[in-house]
Amino acid sequence: MPSADATRGGGSAGSMGKGTLGAGDTLGHKSVLDKQRAAIEKLRAQNEQLKTELLLENKFSVRPGDPFAQALINRLQDEGDMLARKIVLEMRKTKMLDQQLSEMGSTLTTTRNNMGGIFSAKEQSTAVQKRIKLLENRLEKAYVKYNQSITHNKQLRESINNLRRERIMFESIQSNLERELAKLKRDMADMIQQANGAFEAREKAIGEMNALKAQADKEQQGFEEEWRQLTTIIEEDKKERERARAQELAMRERETQELLKMGTLSSAEKKKRITKGSWNVGYNKAMAQNVAAEKVEMYGQAFKRIQDATGIEDIDQLVNTFLAAEDQNYTLFNYVNEVNQEIEKLEDQINIMRGEINKYRETGRELDMTKSRELTEEEARLAASEAQSQLYEKRTDSALSMTTALKAGINDLFERIGCNTPAVRDLLGEEGVTEANLTAYLGIIEQRTNEILQIYAKRKAQQGTDGLAEALLAQPLTQPGNRIIIEPPSTTQEEEVEGLEPEPVEEDRPLTREHLESKVQRTLPRKLETAIKVRPAGADATGGKRGSPTRR
């Protein structure tokens, strides 16, 4: 029934008039108002037709006699009154909606003026497209760096594994060298112990040799002293005998001469001289016997001292003992010479062994230092590789977190603009935003944005407003002097915009989370300055109009 439709339309229009309305809601209200106006006009036409029919009925018959006609007239009058009341209510609602429409139109005009006119949507779409392309480019670069970092991380893992295998091999070699060094040290200790034993034996032999030498020298000195004494006694005895023999010969010659002279002497004188000569000869013999007895006594005393010293009573045995002692002394002398030669040989061997020990010590020390240095270098390289691997893992996690955040933002935008339809889900799959279908999601978002803009343009065309004509003719709503220009963000690096030298970027690995945070904190003000700016057409490009909004 038309009245019921109009009532429902009026109710919906009244409910939609509550709250603040956007541009899309305004277009919806306009279409509802048009429908309500058409319904009101239709009701007015029906009311006029009913009034005309009623007048025609009442013209010929003021009081119809037919009760059915009277009931119909009453019913029609009631319906006319009800429709009149509804018309009044609808007119009130129409006035209220017109007032809201005018308010929304003024709000829309003010918003458009603040945003820069009818071109703001197009410029925003262009800026969004540029931003999307820039983000896609950065995402592609991030993927490239991520793949490079994964490859480099794999190479570093292989290098770390090789270094670990080399470390195990070096540790095995070091353990073998340590065992060889310990064996050499044990051999060296044994050689030192043997050398010490040889030294002790040498010292002992030298001590015994010195004792034997001292004893032999002492015995030799005693023997030589006794021998000198005996030789002196024998020489003196020999001299005494020769002197006594010479005296005896001289006396015999004198006696012979005297006997020759006695031939002329008397017998008494002969007897006297013979007696005197006999006395002299006896005296000389007695003297010689006394001297020999003294020498024998002296020899006896000397032999007695030798016998007391040696404990040997027999002279032959004493002589044999003396000869045996001489032979033993000579044998000991030869033994001492042999021992000295052996000691010299042992000293030479000890010096050679000491040289070899020192050589092995130096070699072992150099080998230990070399192995220690190599081990330290390998540990440093391993620590650096592990630190670099951890750094790459952190950067990989940061890149993954950035990719995850980007996926979440794209999914949120995808849900907000109404792209999540069954057909799209069938096309893209149910797994959501992934690295494989990221560009497909962005393409659908772009397509949906263009569709929304086209729907908006069609609604404006249906309304036939001047704003749509200006939009179609690309004419600004505001005056040229007050035109607002939206500056798109720059695609150049912030350092190039500021005239600064760009930071050196290492291409072989992605940025770490700390580096990204510091870079964002450092470049965020410049990004805000280089973002989408709204400024008047006559204002300076760098300064802008005071109070003009900045859209990111």
UniProtKB/Swiss-Prot annotation:
Lineage: superkingdom: Eukaryota
Coiled-coil region(s): 28-59, 120-260, 331-395
Result of knocking out the encoding gene: Impaired motility and outer dynein arm defects.
An annotated GO BP: outer dynein arm assembly
InterPro entries: ODA-DC/CCD, ODAD1_CC
UniProt keyword ATP-binding present: no
Compositional bias ranges of the Gly residues kind: 8-22
Key words, A-Z: Cell projection, Cilium, Coiled coil, Cytoplasm, Cytoskeleton
Region (Disordered), start-end ranges: 1-27, 482-515, 528-552
Pfam families: ODAD1_CC
Subcellular location: Cytoplasm, Cytoskeleton, Cilium axoneme
TM helices/strands, residue ranges: none
Family named by the database record: Belongs to the ODA1/DCC2 family.
Subunit field text: Component of the outer dynein arm complex.
Described function: Component of the outer dynein arm complex required for assembly of the outer dynein arm-docking complex (ODA-DC) and the outer dynein arm onto the doublet microtubule.
The protein's name in its UniProt record: Outer dynein arm protein 1
Source organism (scientific name): Chlamydomonas reinhardtii (Chlamydomonas smithii)
Lineage, opening ranks: Eukaryota, Viridiplantae, Chlorophyta, core chlorophytes, Chlorophyceae
